[in-house]
Regions:
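A conserved donor-nucleotide-binding helix/loop in the catalytic core
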Residues: 61-94, 102, 190-200
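Conserved donor-nucleotide/metal-binding helix-loop-beta segment in metal-dependent transferases, i.e.
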Residues: 100-139
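Long, low-complexity C-terminal extensions of enzymes
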Residues: 226-263
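Short, solvent-exposed loop/turn segments at secondary-structure junctions
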Residues: 10-12, 45-47, 63-64, 98-100, ...
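Catalytic core and acceptor-binding pocket of nucleotide-sugar-dependent glycosyltransferases
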Residues: 145-232
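A structural signal for short, well-ordered beta-strand segments and their strand-loop junctions
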Residues: 40, 91-95, 118-120, 160, ...
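N-terminal anchoring/stem segment of glycosyltransferases
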Residues: 1-72, 80-87, 250-263
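Active-site regions of enzymes building and remodeling cell-envelope glycoconjugates
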Residues: 51-64, 111-119, 223-228
Length: 263
């Protein structure tokens, strides 16, 4: 069984790669029947252990800045669509700052008689009513979800499923992003708003609890399985440091977007 890991670490986010990779090699799908293929989209000239592990595929990816690094992540994945179809049976996207903390196996693999999708409940909306979910509420957006709809609020940081099903998700969301862009709309929470819309229409076969996206330093009523490392910790440089590389370009883009919206 071939498991594809989709991972983006442009700019200074490559600081998270080594520990993510080592934790995956220790805890994620370590049964001998699984082969892990790492598809790492980065502008870094070198990745930890790539010279020793032929299953680490470094794919050149420029830093798109905010919000495109998240909004267009599905466009990024589809750049290697044919390769993913050839080389994987399952695909999972993990945010750069995640860390596996205990063994994970077949419980994350949707069955062949399901729609083949997996989503993860956002820890900030655990046990909250859907009246508190911050879905996209603008009717003009492709991510629009009406009040009263939606059973869960899904996080953007971990999703996946059978390769065919997940690539269909990527294709559909890309078309939505492009349609919104043509109408000068950016969904409120970017890719997360769009994935919530997709999962409303196509409820995932597996919905993981927030134990699989457990924010560092939080107190939730379960043991963390995958930790969200705190970007503000000194060893990572802090949130502003991680985004600083493209800060000027981001400001220029935001000004341009405001001008377009004002026209």
């Amino acid at each position: 069984m071939r498991i594809g890991i989709l991972y983006i670490c442009t700019g200074k986010y490559d600081i998270f790669w080594k520990d993510f990779y080592l934790s995956a090699e220790r805890y994620f799908m370590q049964d001998q029947s699984f082969i892990l293929e790492y598809y790492v989209f980065t502008d870094s000239p070198q990745l930890y252990d790539e010279e020793n592990n032929e299953h680490i595929h470094r794919i050149k990816q420029k830093n798109l800045g905010w919000p495109d690094n998240t909004l267009k992540r599905f466009h990024t994945f589809l750049r290697i669509k044919e390769q993913l179809e050839r080389e994987t049976d399952y695909l999972f996207f993990f945010n750069a700052n995640l860390l596996f903390t205990c063994p994970i196996g077949k419980e994350m693999l949707p069955s062949s008689n399901s729609n083949g999708l997996l989503g993860t409940i956002h820890p900030g909306f655990y046990n909250k009513p859907n009246s508190e979910f911050t879905y996209e509420r603008r009717v003009a957006s492709t991510a629009y979800i009406p009040e009263g709809k939606g059973l869960y609020y899904y996080a953007g940081g971990l999703s996946g499923g059978c390769t065919e099903s997940y690539l269909q998700l990527c294709t559909t969301i890309c078309s939505w992003v492009d349609k919104d862009a043509a109408n000068h709309i950016i969904p409120i929470w970017h890719d997360e708003s769009l994935i919530n819309k997709y999962f409303l229409d196509n409820p995932p076969a597996i919905t993981l609890p927030p134990a699989y996206l457990y924010p560092e330093g939080w107190s939730l009523p379960f043991k963390p399985i995958i930790l969200i490392r705190d970007k503000n910790k000194p060893e990572y440089g802090g949130h502003e440091f991680l985004r600083r590389k493209n800060s000027l370009w981001v400001k220029i883009k935001l000004i341009c977007q405001k001008i377009k919206l004002a026209d």
